[in-house]
């Protein structure tokens, strides 16, 4: 019963009208994915993180990128992120020019983790877009 409730919770809270609630939800989903990867590191939960990469509020995007940093920073989990990375890599790369400085900085840090822990995912073109910024 608890797992059933937890399965529905992100769907409701990730679409909440309050950005604070969306930010908390994404932060916690990231924690769940790291702690209980067999249950929560799945496409059905990763999609919420992917959707919030586009959120209009800075704090939600920052929490989203930080949650992804926690996942990409763990080599044991990166193999399970291949499909997600394929779908959202271009968006993650484009976030380095986000209008909010804090989001752009976290996006660069995320790309560094992807480069270190997932060989061959970032192409030269992706890396070249980061060079002028750093």
From Swiss-Prot:
GO cellular component: nucleus
Location relative to the cell: Nucleus
Gene3D superfamilies, A to Z: Leucine-rich Repeat Variant
Main location: nucleus
Domain SCD: 10-95
Source taxon at top rank: Eukaryota
Pfam entry (one): SCD
Disulfide linkage: none
Key word Nucleus present: yes
SUPFAM superfamilies (alphabetical): ARM repeat
Matching InterPro entries: ARM-like, ARM-type_fold, Cohesin_Scc3/SA, SCD
Keyword field: Nucleus
Entry similarity comment: Belongs to the SCC3 family.
Name of the protein in question: Putative STAG3-like protein 2
High-level lineage: Eukaryota, Metazoa, Chordata, Craniata, Vertebrata
